[in-house]
Amino acid sequence: MKNGQLKTQNSELKTMKTFALVGCNISYSFSRRYFAEKFAQEKITDCEYINFDIPTIEVLPALIRATPTLLGMNVTIPYKEAVLPLLDQQSEELVAIKACNTIKIGSSGQLKGYNTDYIGFRDSLVPYLKPHHNRALILGTGGASKAVAFALNQLGIPYQLVSREASSVALSYHELTKEVIQSHSLIVNTTPLGTSPKTEEFPPIPYQWITREHLLYDLIYNPEKTAFLAKGEVQGATILNGYSMLVLQAEAAWKIWNSEQ
């Protein structure tokens, strides 16, 4: 860590390997539940996964110092961008995406940041793609949209950003004409609209022009079927929520933590 690296494994007697989720108000956490189940199912007895539920990112260095068995962290809202200044190294993908959701702690305490959200999105999307899914609308321009855009670039799918207000890089929702909707057969919601408990909310797109040629992907996983997906389903579209993305990004993080690099 900058301004003095932190040694996190200072005793060979400490055999437990600790991993953590960094976030705020994360008692609902998918990650902690997922890794607890993974460790139980795979009989991994020397690992634990805990929550660092913190009010500000400035608290994190002290928590790392206080947890000498800590080897890796996941990072969730609202700290994916705020954590960047604490990193000693960034992966090539993270430099491009600028939103960190995975950190590996080196043997001398250095923090290297990664983004595995794009891996989770890309690898969960590919099985559903058909040749006509060749142009995409990305709803939202926050950190999650950057990971989605990076993945679509890898897949060779051009995309158009959509935001509440028009800009040099984004259309506004008011500019989504029938022609725009029908010429973009992949629509990805990266906004929080529709997340539990506000399940009645949805992005204000003209759903009446969605057809069975469309694939609607919502990064939200709770509820399982958001209003965005339900409205697309009524029009005959294929729908996909964010649960598989979460699983795949978690497994990508696990692979990073256990790699020799």
Model-inferred region functions:
Residues M1-T15:
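Short, basic, low-complexity termini and linkers enriched in Ser/Thr/Gly/Pro
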Residues M16-Y128:
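Phosphate/diphosphate ligand-binding glycine-rich loop within oxidoreductases
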Residues G23, N115-Y118, L125, L129, ...:
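Glycine-rich adenosine-cofactor-binding loop
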Residues V75-A82, A144, P192-T195, N222:
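Short glycine-rich anion-binding loops that position phosphate/pyrophosphate groups of nucleotides
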Residues D123-S124, T238-Q261:
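Active-site capping/gating segments
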Residues Q154-P158, Q235-T238:
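Conserved S-adenosyl-L-methionine
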Residues L155-L171:
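NAD(P)-binding Rossmann-fold cofactor-contacting core
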Residues V169-L240:
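Rossmann-like adenosine-cofactor binding region
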